[in-house]
């Protein structure tokens, strides 16, 4: 999950019944700041508020997990409050309560499980800062990435037969984010998502991530992870065409194309010394090509 500098967190202490509340740990980051579209104008307006309620819940839980000021104990306690509020056992966390009520109102209470899966990932973010191998990272992504796409598919009443392709794309997006932010995640939170065995195989060390230019071994480790990500994107290449809802299909096509381009960039550029992102013009160009391909396929 993407980190944030401690100074960007609100210093105000918001408490509920003398206990730290998630609202005290907000980063101020919104859906416009994410690396990929979140409920963009392409999504059916009927579904957009539901997806945004899920996003607000996930964003707040992510902020809690990534906060570098609150103690581990406090962060885990807040995440537990979010869980109990989502399941209806309590009402201590407003964003979780709003999400639960939104889902029940729209007959989507069966999708609450996706929020619970996300909370498992955020608990791991608090407690785990290294991943031994690719399989361990993929297991983490099963909770941190796949539930987001699965939720969107369920909201659109798409077939769960699409889940394998969804999981591949969502996992690829998560790994891309990890590689883009690998230096920041290490410096600010002592977190390394590049699997240890990949780094060890090429002689890269944790200290390499603390520099402002990637060493040759670290560049090799990043390239290895990026190549594995390309394999995930091959598995998701038919995803957008298989989606029944045309608007969602276009959005997924755009995301797939952006992910493919960013993965290629990560094999050629140093995320420690430069920002490996697309500017607005590049994003619009890629989006146009992807959208046209989906609409006229």
UniProtKB/Swiss-Prot annotation:
CDD domains to which the protein is assigned, alphabetical: Trans_IPPS_HH (cd00683)
Reaction(s) catalysed (UniProt annotation): presqualene diphosphate + H2O = hydroxysqualene + diphosphate
EC class name: lyase
EC number: 4.2.3.156
Key words, A-Z: Lyase
SUPFAM superfamilies named among the record's database cross-references: Terpenoid synthases
InterPro entries found in the cross-reference section: HSQ_synthase_HpnC, Isoprenoid_synthase_dom_sf, Squ/phyt_synthse, Trans_IPPS_HH
Domain of life: Bacteria
Family of the protein in this entry: Belongs to the phytoene/squalene synthase family. HpnC subfamily.
Protein name (database record): Hydroxysqualene synthase
Gene giving rise to this polypeptide: hpnC
């Amino acid at each position: 999950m993407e980190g944030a500098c401690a100074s960007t967190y609100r210093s105000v202490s918001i408490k509920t019944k003398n206990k730290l509340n998630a609202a005290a740990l907000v980063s101020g980051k919104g859906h416009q700041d994410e690396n990929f579209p979140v409920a963009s104008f392409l999504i059916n307006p009927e579904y957009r508020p539901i997806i945004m309620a899920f996003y607000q819940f996930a964003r707040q839980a992510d902020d809690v997990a990534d906060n570098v000021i609150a103690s581990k104990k406090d962060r885990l306690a807040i995440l537990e409050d979010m869980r109990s509020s989502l399941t209806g056992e309590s009402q201590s966390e407003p964003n979780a309560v709003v999400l639960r009520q939104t889902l029940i109102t729209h007959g989507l209470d069966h999708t609450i499980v996706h929020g619970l899966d996300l909370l498992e990932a955020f608990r791991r973010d608090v407690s785990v800062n290294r991943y031994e191998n690719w399989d361990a990272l993929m297991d983490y992504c099963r909770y941190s990435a796949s539930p987001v796409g699965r939720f969107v598919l369920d909201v659109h009443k798409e077939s769960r037969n699409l889940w394998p392709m969804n999981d591949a794309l969502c996992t690829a997006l998560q790994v891309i984010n990890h590689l883009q932010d690998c230096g920041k995640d290490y410096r600010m939170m002592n977190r390394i998502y590049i699997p240890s065995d990949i780094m060890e195989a090429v002689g890269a060390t944790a200290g390499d991530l603390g520099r402002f230019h990637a060493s040759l071994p670290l560049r090799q480790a990043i390239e290895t992870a990026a190549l594995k990500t390309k394999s995930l994107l091959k598995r998701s290449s038919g995803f957008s065409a298989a989606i029944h809802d045309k608007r969602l299909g276009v959005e997924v096509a755009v995301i797939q194309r952006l992910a493919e381009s960013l993965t290629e960039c990560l094999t050629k550029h140093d995320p420690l010394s430069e920002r490996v992102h697309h500017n607005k013009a590049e994003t619009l160009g890629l989006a146009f090509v992807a959208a046209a391909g989906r609409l006229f396929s």
